[in-house]
Amino acid sequence: MMPRGNAMLVGVGGSGRQSLARLASHIAGIGVFVIEITKLYRLIEWRDDMKRLFEITGVSNTPTAFLFNDTQLKEQAFLEDINNILSSGEIPSLYGKDELPAIYDGVRKRAADAESGGTAEELWAFFIESIRSNLHVILAMSQPLCPY
């Protein structure tokens, strides 16, 4: 994977898009994060999964590929969130104010080691920068099936 690299794999089902993504991730030595879609999976579950992904990449500082395919698009908001991740590294309003102190505490030591500062704004910026550096979004799309 290229630094801050992402990928979109387009092809018919069964052509090896997901296998290729997993192979590339393995070769790069990074983990793969895949969400499990169920019948009742909606925006609340999606946002919880995004928080887990951000904790892995932003707090734990673990390089991770997020593999997402078009059959997992249950709501258009999923695609909007992916667009936000790709453009800015964050999802607006993902966290409530009560969740932020745990994030700040999780990145405080690494931020201090990087001489990044210790204000809430600086810790948030460090968290987002860690996500942008560690998260690689891989979209596996099948053009005729993609509703968006």
Give names to the regions the model predicted.
Residues 1-148:
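Conformational switch/transducer regions in large eukaryotic molecular machines and scaffolds
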